[in-house]
A protein has these predicted regions:
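Proteins enriched for Cys/Gly/acidic motifs involved in redox and nucleic-acid/cofactor modification
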Residues: 1-184
């Protein structure tokens, strides 16, 4: 199956998208620029402009690829799933639970049945470790060691979108960093 991923937003989203790409490649799927069977949009919702960019991209992808399975994940999908549902997407994933999102995408591609899996409560106490990867087309490798926030600043939506703060255990973070360093 051919796929393409699109990322809007922060470094955490970039890291999570790279992990999804690596997982799809490991399963034997092919990354492509066009004629894709599967399209994934990892979204941001930190501003109204970000929300508009999400909607614009999702609409364009649906219009240009009416037969592709379109999956949307990330903060916009988590907080504004009703808006995302209205955009004719096939799979909506929640923040955290990327493995379930990937399985739902592949199921939707096989069965042509839409799936919505948004966890409004975001009560995941554990850190979701995603596979660390090499540099790919980048000059620096990324390693996600923390997600979420508990500060609830009046101006910030991140605690609502990503849930409470969770961290990768220190020993595991060190081991992953050493592995990335050994890979160059």
């Amino acid at each position: 199956m051919k796929f393409q991923c699109y990322t809007l937003g922060c470094k955490a989203n970039q890291y999570e998208t790279q992990a999804l790409e690596r997982q799809l490649l490991a399963l034997g799927h092919e990354q492509a620029d066009r004629d894709c069977d599967l399209l994934i949009v990892n979204t941001c919702t930190v501003t109204a402009v970000a929300d508009r960019k999400n909607r614009t991209l999702i609409r364009r992808l649906r219009r240009e690829n009416p037969n592709a399975v379109l999956g949307v994940c990330g903060c916009y999908a988590q907080l504004k799933s009703d808006e995302v549902r209205a955009l004719d997407v096939d799979v909506i994933g929640r923040s955290g639970g990327r493995e379930a999102f990937l399985q739902n995408l592949l199921h939707a591609a096989r069965e042509r049945a839409p799936i919505v899996a948004v966890d409004e409560a975001l009560r995941r106490p554990e850190f979701e470790e995603l596979p660390a990867g090499g540099l790919a087309a980048r000059t620096r490798a990324m390693l996600k060691v923390q997600d979420g926030c508990c500060n609830f600043c009046t101006y910030c939506i991140i605690p609502y979108a990503r849930g409470p703060v969770r961290s990768l255990p220190l020993a595991r973070a060190v081991a992953l960093a050493e592995g990335l360093a050994a890979d160059g």
